[in-house]
Amino acid sequence: MNCEREQLRGNQEAAAAPDTMAQPYASAQFAPPQNGIPAEYTAPHPHPAPEYTGQTTVPEHTLNLYPPAQTHSEQSPADTSAQTVSGTATQTDDAAPTDGQPQTQPSENTENKSQPKRLHVSNIPFRFRDPDLRQMFGQFGKILDVEIIFNERGSKGFGFVTFENSADADRAREKLHGTVVEGRKIEVNNATARVMTNKKTVNPYTNGWKLNPVVGAVYSPEFYAGTVLLCQANQEGSSMYSAPSSLVYTSAMPGFPYPAATAAAAYRGAHLRGRGRTVYNTFRAAAPPPPIPAYGGVVYQDGFYGADIYGGYAAYRYAQPTPATAAAYSDSYGRVYAADPYHHALAPAPTYGVGAMPQGSSPSTDFRGAKLHTSRPLLSGS
């Protein structure tokens, strides 16, 4: 019974709680019909009741949970609306350049259309000339230039037409491309820029050599013997170094300068061949009396020419013409020689072979077969 009473008491106490709970809600319902402001002030009254805080918190939380959810829901549309507004703003910003671009593009197009344009016309009849091509394209607009490419045999079958206005050029290209003129299908295309290639500079010498005087004297001795050695000898002012007036040397000889053979022209110095001279060189000139006593260094371009000195004068000599008719002769290598004025005073000289060279002056041959001779002093008498 006691337990039942306690349960009843507990039930009575629990039943009393809803009555008290109903009062604050009932009191709070009167204010909202007038204004929203009294409700805000009447709502705090139930909160101070300490006995029902545990029970009232749940409905309060439930009540408070809805407004925040509503506020969040209200804020989210605002945010979305703000986002949409900002998005539209960005779109309008982006749209502004797009609106401006069509304005700039027509100006660029008009500028391009007003510029000259060149067309490449190919497969045109070979009898066509510039007036014919101008007449064909002149109906589409003003033409600045017409050019048909020719070679030594005539027209090459293509040319160029330059219009003052690029729009006229485009219209002419569309109309005339693929048309048949005198049995030939004409092709009209936009001319492309030429690709400029680096052409080799033209060398003043026809053989393509551009050497310094030392190396050039080896590979082109006659040129430097005429322009360097003899000019230097004439500048000395001495009779023993003077060159004969019959020798003609020009500095404009192209490449290997082998001019026409004259009576006294001997570029290889035939009067010195086989004499046992101190230093043999390609700097030798003709055979004037007295002979030139000084010669430069000793490198021969070809081994065959160097070998004839060791073989002796008689071993190398060819059949000499008579003194009355002796002018000049040339061997099979294109070298021009004059008749030796001293051959009547010379006997066959086998002693001027290799054995006649002093010790320590044996010939040395490089990879070109060139021979170096340094047997006697630089200067010697005749």
UniProtKB/Swiss-Prot annotation:
Gene Ontology CC, one term: nucleus
One GO term of the biological process aspect: regulation of alternative mRNA splicing, via spliceosome
Chain positions covered by the region annotation Disordered: 1-121, 357-382
Site, as annotated: Interaction with RNA: 118, 126-127, 151, 156, 160, 184, 194
GO MF term (any one): mRNA binding
Compartments (UniProt record): Nucleus; Cytoplasm
Any Pfam family matching the protein: RRM_1
Listed Polar residues bias regions: 70-87, 100-113
Asymmetric dimethylarginine carried by residues: 317
Compositional bias per record (Low complexity), positions renumbered to this chain: 88-99
Alphabetized PROSITE patterns for the sequence: RRM
Keywords: Cytoplasm, Methylation, mRNA processing, mRNA splicing, Nucleus, RNA-binding
RRM domain location: 117-193
Quaternary context: Binds to the C-terminus of ATXN2.
Role played: RNA-binding protein that regulates alternative splicing events by binding to 5'-UGCAUGU-3' elements. Prevents binding of U2AF2 to the 3'-splice site. Regulates alternative splicing of tissue-specific exons and of differentially spliced exons during erythropoiesis.
Record-given protein name: RNA binding protein fox-1 homolog 1
Gene source species: Pongo abelii (Sumatran orangutan)
Gene: RBFOX1
